[in-house]
């Protein structure tokens, strides 16, 4: 039997996942992080994007997070996220429309343009699309 670590994914709405996993892959500030049992302790920011859990037996679950924090301690991984959705609940067409709208907003800058908000909407829509694509790859 493969080694496991306990993983909790928590959002403002409550606990989304709690259980044993063989691996957690998340999108950190410096790239993707793979967390397996025995990983060194760590705390890091997470960017919007997919979180992939490899559960006991190799089954994978993919979630989308809009950002948050990852904490790794001996025998425990905790993800504290602003918003969490199961990848299967994401609407690819809606995410593509949001991506196009954000790209349009960035190209039509006016005097009252909020670049930070437009860039955040663009990053979130792109991360949702990346999550859907990653989920499809895993199937």
Swiss-Prot record:
Q: Does the keyword Cell inner membrane apply?
A: yes
Q: Which Gene3D superfamilies match?
A: ATP synthase delta/epsilon subunit, C-terminal domain, F0F1 ATP synthase delta/epsilon subunit, N-terminal
Query: Which superkingdom, per the lineage?
Result: Bacteria
Where, subcellularly, is it found? Answer: Cell inner membrane
Where exactly are the transmembrane stretches of this chain? Answer: none
- Extract the SUPFAM superfamilies matched here: Epsilon subunit of F1F0-ATP synthase C-terminal domain, Epsilon subunit of F1F0-ATP synthase N-terminal domain
- InterPro entries referenced in this protein's UniProt entry, alphabetically: ATP_F1_dsu/esu_C_sf, ATP_synth_F1_dsu/esu, ATP_synth_F1_dsu/esu_N, ATP_synth_F1_esu_C, ATPsynth_dsu/esu_N
Q: How does it sit in the membrane?
A: Peripheral membrane protein
Keywords (alphabetical) are: ATP synthesis, Cell inner membrane, Cell membrane, CF(1), Hydrogen ion transport, Ion transport, Membrane, Transport
The Swiss-Prot or TrEMBL record annotates one GO molecular function as: proton-transporting ATP synthase activity, rotational mechanism
* Disulphide bonds in the chain: none
Which cellular component appears as one GO term in the record? proton-transporting ATP synthase complex
The family this protein is said to belong to: Belongs to the ATPase epsilon chain family.
The job of this chain, per UniProt, is described as: Produces ATP from ADP in the presence of a proton gradient across the membrane.
Q: How does it assemble?
A: F-type ATPases have 2 components, CF(1) - the catalytic core - and CF(0) - the membrane proton channel. CF(1) has five subunits: alpha(3), beta(3), gamma(1), delta(1), epsilon(1). CF(0) has three main subunits: a, b and c.
Q: Which NCBIfam families match?
A: ATP_synt_epsi, PRK00571.1-4
Output this protein's name: ATP synthase epsilon chain
Q: Which species is this UniProt entry from?
A: Pseudomonas putida (strain W619)
């Amino acid at each position: 039997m493969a080694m496991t670590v306990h993983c909790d994914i928590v959002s403002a709405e409550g606990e989304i996942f709690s259980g044993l996993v063989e691996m957690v892959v998340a999108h950190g500030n410096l790239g993707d992080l793979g967390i397996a049992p025995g990983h060194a302790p760590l705390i890091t920011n997470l960017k919007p994007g997919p979180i992939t859990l490899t559960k006991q037996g190799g089954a994978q679950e993919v979630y989308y997070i809009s950002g948050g924090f990852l904490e790794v301690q001996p025998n425990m991984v905790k993800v504290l996220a602003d918003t969490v959705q199961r990848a299967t609940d994401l609407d690819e067409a809606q995410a593509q429309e949001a991506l196009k709208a954000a790209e349009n907003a960035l190209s039509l800058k006016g005097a009252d343009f909020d670049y930070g908000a437009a860039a955040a909407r663009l990053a979130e829509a792109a991360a949702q699309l990346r999550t859907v694509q990653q989920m499809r790859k895993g199937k």
